[in-house]
A protein has these predicted regions:
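Short aromatic-acidic-glycine turn motif
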Residues: 71-82
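N-terminal edge beta-strand
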Residues: 23-51
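Bacterial N-terminal signal peptides that target proteins for export
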Residues: 1-7
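C-terminal segment of classical bacterial N-terminal signal peptides
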Residues: 13-20
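Beta-strand signatures of extracellular beta-sandwich domains
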Residues: 64-68, 116
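Extracellular/periplasmic metallocenter environments
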Residues: 37, 88-139
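Beta-strand cores of secreted/periplasmic/IMS beta-sandwich domains, seen most often
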Residues: 41-65, 100-109, 136-139
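Short edge beta-strand segments in beta-sheet-rich domains
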Residues: 26, 62, 128-132
Length: 139
């Protein structure tokens, strides 16, 4: 497990789109977090479309986004100081209380991908307390 805050590989790409996506609109999804919920917690996106998810932590504790979709997408970038990198893949996105993190990616695999917060508070998993959801990728 390796932590990286400002590595070039995970710096938010802004409005730049990867090759092959020129002229396509980036779909922006705002997800707010607090104890112990993602809202909305069900999201649908299209395979091949660039997606920007803005996580706004309105809670009183730190939260994070963990999902297998991070391994089922291309050109994954994050604007956050807390990013866990596993090999050459982003493993999770962390966002402190009162902060916003932006995740950009291009989902490539159709399916439903669960997501959750893996933080704990007083020994209790945020995921077990209900902080989870799903992203469905359709054609």
């Amino acid at each position: 497990m390796r932590w990286s805050g400002a590595a070039a590989a995970v710096v938010l790409a802004g409005t730049m789109l990867p090759a092959g996506y020129a002229g396509e609109e980036v779909k922006t999804i705002a997800i707010s977090t607090q104890e112990f919920v993602f809202a909305p917690n069900l999201v649908t996106v299209h395979a091949g479309q660039r997606v920007r998810i803005l996580f706004s932590n309105r809670g009183t504790v730190n939260h994070e986004f963990v999902s297998p979709i991070l391994n089922a997408a291309e050109d994954v970038t994050v604007s956050s100081q807390g990013v866990r990198v596993e090999g050459d893949k982003i493993g999770e996105v962390n966002f402190a209380k009162g902060k916003v993190a932006a995740l950009e990616m291009t989902p490539t695999k159709v399916g439903t991908f669960q997501f959750w917060c893996a933080e704990t508070t007083a020994g209790r998993s945020h995921r077990d307390l209900g902080m989870r959801g799903a992203i469905t990728v359709v054609k």
